[in-house]
Amino acid sequence: MALRRLAALLSLAVLLSAGLAAVSATSQNTGDTVIIWGRNKDEGSLREACDAGRYTTVIISFLSAFGYIPGTYKLDISGHQVSAVGPDIKYCQSKGKLILLAIGGQGGEYSLPSSQAAVDLHDHLWYSYLGGRRNGVYRPFGDANVNGIDFFIDQGAREHYNELAKMLYDHNKDYRATVGVMVTATTRCGYPDHRLDEALATGLFHRIHVKMFSDGRCPAWSRRQSFEKWAKTYPQSRVLIGVVASPDVDKDAYMPPEALNNLLQFINKQPNFGGVMVWDRFYDKKTGFTAHL
């Protein structure tokens, strides 16, 4: 058992190292390009997203139900065949892509009402999607491990997500010279995001994706100031700007590629600027948005 676990850890370390190398090779202006996948069956497979050649990270979305009923979890990937995702994860990782799983989302049924609920969710994530193995535990993606967890908490209370972040991050002590479990967050652009501020205060998040959409507190004229506030508040995290790939997602928040490229010339001067997160693969496939960054 110990040898198998060591082999699994070494394998994941190699994959993640390749992903980090891919990140370093991205455009100096754009940085990392992260795409949300799993919101529309017509977006194509995860493998197709990785073969598009425009993304360094794909976030599978969402684990949309947890916490309300102990032991009850729901993975919602909009009708995609779950059994096909595992092989696609391994294929994407072999191409140097990072694959994250987002928890939460819009319209799900989730919360962490207690410390025990945080422990239970940690165990579910570790044994069902990450590097843990336990007899009798169903793994939706088979023997494929995602590279980390994104906290996409869009409803409910703030309590206990800080505890979950600490438990997930603590696994990194088992990995040498690399990050074994990435811990990231997708926040609203208005500072602070009260649902995630306690979790972010741990200082353990590798990345923060700041959504410049679905939040009336961030009109177009304030985007630069909002991003810089987040970047300066969390200097230990790589901070990415979150945008939509089409006005059909959020007409008021949509920035054409030329407008985003202009903004990037200023915000990429932040020392912890990380790149761009785009909602989502379906709309990016239709519009070719990221091809112009």
Swiss-Prot record:
Domain GH18 stretches: 31-293
GO cellular component term of the entry, any: extracellular region
CDD domains assigned to the protein according to its UniProt record, in alphabetical order: GH18_hevamine_XipI_class_III (cd02877)
Record's subcellular location: Secreted
Upregulating conditions: Induced by exogenous treatment with ascorbate, dehydroascorbate, citrate, sodium chloride and methyl jasmonate in roots. Induced by wounding in roots.
Cystines in this chain: C50-C92, C189-C218
Cross-referenced PROSITE patterns: GH18_2 (PS51910)
InterPro entries xrefs: Cts1-like, Glyco_hydro18_cat, Glycoside_hydrolase_SF, Glycosyl_Hydrlase18_Chitinase
UniProt signal peptide: 1-21
GO molecular function: enzyme inhibitor activity
Expression by tissue: Expressed in mature grain.
GO biological processes: carbohydrate metabolic process; defense response to fungus
UniProt keyword list: Disulfide bond, Plant defense, Secreted, Signal
Misc: Plants silencing XIP do not exhibit visible phenotype under normal growth conditions.
Protein family: Belongs to the glycosyl hydrolase 18 family. Xylanase inhibitor subfamily.
Protein's job: Fungal xylanase inhibitor. Possesses competitive inhibiting activity against several fungal endo-1,4-beta-D-xylanases belonging to glycoside hydrolase family 10 (GH10) and family 11 (GH11). May function in plant defense against secreted fungal pathogen xylanases. Is similar to class III chitinases, but does not exhibit chitinase activity.
Protein name: Xylanase inhibitor protein XIP
Species, as recorded: Oryza sativa subsp. japonica
Gene name of the encoded protein: XIP
